[in-house]
Amino acid sequence: MADGVFQGAIGIDLGTTYSCVATYESSVEIIANEQGNRVTPSFVAFTPEERLIGDAAKNQAALNPKNTVFDAKRLIGRRFDEESVQNDMKTWPFKVVDVEGAPVIEVEYLGETKQFSPQEISSMVLTKMKEIAEAKIGKKVEKAVITVPAYFNDAQRQATKDAGAISGLNVLRIINEPTAAAIAYGLGAGKSDKERHVLIFDLGGGTFDVSLLHIAGGVYTVKSTSGNTHLGGQDFDTNLLEHFKSDFKKKTGLDISNDARALRRLRTAAERAKRTLSSVTQTTVEVDSLFDGEDFEASLTRARFEDLNAALFKSTLEPVEQVLKDAKISKSQIDEVVLVGGSTRIPKVQKLLSDFFDGKQLEKSINPDEAVAYGAAVQGAILTGQSTSDETKDLLLLDVAPLSLGVGMQGDIFGVVVPRNTTVPTIKRRTFTTVGDNQTTVQFPVYQGERVNCKENTLLGEFDLKNIPPMQAGEPVLEAIFEVDANGILKVTAVEKSTGKSANITISNAVGRLSSEDIEKMVNQAEEFKAADEAFAKRHEAKQRLESYVASIEQTVTDPVLSSKLKRGSKTKIEAALADALAALQIEDGSTEEYRKAEVGLKRVVTKAMSSR
C-alpha cells in the first residue's frame, strides 16, 4: 500500500447477504473487489488452516457448512431468546450458543473451537470492505460511514458501530439505508430542484425498510419510516428450499433436513432459481447427487414461486401504508416510488407496489445493489469536508428515530418520551414522580417500541436515581431527559429538580452490549487473526513458489537435450538438491522460512551447475 492516509471517509453498505463499498474523490465510485465484483458476499469461513472472507468464503460453503458464517446482521444487537433468532437457528448450518443471554457463533478454526460475537463476524466483513477500498485508493483508510436498516433499534445500531470499531474504523456516522439511497436518487442525473415527496422501498437480502422523504433543494427530510428487520431475499429462498425439500422427499423418500451440505447446495440452487425467475417465467433446477447418490431435478414456474411467497410479498405493503399514515400524506401525493435492494427485482413485488400506487410507474434509475453505499460515500465526503461539488456542499440530511423511546412506569405502562419519527438529533424531556411515600430511589427502565405494555417492547437498559429527598408520594419532580444523536443512539439522564441530583446512562448495560474493554480485546484479536491470515498467505505463496521452481528444474533434468549439456557430477548434485526440496514440500506444516531455505538451496546448486557447464 502507498504511504499516507485517505482524508475522506468510505461508505459501506453492510448487508445481510452482500456488502458494497464506495468512495468519493470528486465523484462517487463503487469499488470492485479482487474478483471484479461490485458487491461482496457477507460470508466468513473458518478452516483448519485459514480464514476466508467474501467470495472465497461463499464459494466453499457447501464443503464446509458448519464453519461458514453468514446472516450476522440477523443476530447483531439481538438477544439469544428472541423468536427470530430461535427460528433462524433452525435454518443455519453453523452453531449459535447462548452466552449470558447474547447469541454467539461457535466454529472450528485452526484446529480449535472458537466463539465469535455477531459484532466480530461483521467486523471481519467490514475489514474486507476496508481492504477493497484501500487496494483501489492506494492509501490507508481510517474513517467510514456505515449504513443500517432504518428500522434497526438502539441495540442493533450500537452493535454495528462496535463492529466498525473492532475493524479499526472510526465510524463517523451510522446512517439509515433508505436515506442513503435517497441521496443517490436525489443526486442522480436530470433531477430538478423542485420539491417532491419520495417513497424509498428497500427490500434487501435480510431486511426491509420503507421511508418517506421530502426532498427540496439539497434538504432531505425523512417524514416517517417503517419496516421489518427480518424480511428479505433469504426468506424467499427458505420458502423455496422447503418446497424443494418436500419435493425431493416425495420423489425419493429421502429427507435431507439434517444434512448441512445437501441443504447448502439446495439453497444455492434455490437462490439461483429465484434470480432467474425475475427475467423468465420458468426454470429448471438441477443438483447432481444431492443426497445418497440421488440427483435432484425440478421445474419451477414464476407463478409457483410467487404462490410460495405470496404472504411475504403481500406483507411488504403494510409498512408502506404505515409511513403514509404516519406522515399524514395520501398516496396520490407521492411523486416518486424508488426501488432499492436486490429483492425489488422480483416482478411480483414490483407489481404489488405499482398496483398499490394505482398503476404508478416505479423509479428504477438507481442501481438497487449500489445506491446505499453510494449515498453513504456522499455523506462520508460531507462529514470529512471532502465534498467539493455544488450539489453536495449544501446537502442536509434530517433523519428520524424509527421507534418510540421511553421509560417503564408503574404497572409496566410504557411512558413515551421520544415518539417515533421524531427528527434526530433531538432532546426530549418528560417529568415523573414517586409512587410511594418517602421513596428515595426510583428505577428507570428504558424501552424502545410501540406497545403500551413494556414487556412487549425492547428493554435497552435501566438505571437508578438515588438520594431523592423523602417526600409524600407524587411530590418529587423527576425529569427524564432523552438525547438521541445523529446515529439514532440514545443517552438518558434523570434529574431530581429540588436537589439537582442526576444519574445518567448511555445505554450500555443491555444484553450483548460490548464494553470498551471488550472492544479493545476484540480489536487485538482481529489484529492477531489478520497476522495469522497474512502468515498463512505468505507460507502458501512460498510453498507455491518452491513447487513451481521444483517443477521447472525437474523438467530441465528430465529433458534429454538440456540434461545432456550438464556434467555428470552437476546432474547428481541437482538431483540431490531436488530430493531435499521435495522433502521440504512433504512436511505437513512447513514454515515460510523452511520453504524459502529449500528454494534458495536448490537455486544455489542449480546456478552453480549451470554456470560450470
UniProtKB/Swiss-Prot annotation:
GO CC terms: cytoplasm
One BP annotation, GO: translation
Domain of life: Eukaryota
Keyword Disulfide bond attributed: no
Example GO molecular function: ATP hydrolysis activity
Chain positions covered by the region annotation Substrate binding domain (SBD): 403-613
Reactions this protein catalyses: ATP + H2O = ADP + phosphate + H(+)
Leading EC class: hydrolase
Chief location bin: cytoplasm
Subunit structure as annotated in this protein's UniProt entry: Binds to ribosomes. Binds close to the ribosomal tunnel exit via contacts with both ribosomal proteins and rRNA. Directly interacts with nascent polypeptides. This interaction is dependent on the ribosome-associated complex (RAC). Interacts with SSE1. Interacts with FES1.
Entry-linked NCBIfam families: PRK00290.1 (NF001413)
Name of the molecule in the record: Ribosome-associated molecular chaperone SSB1
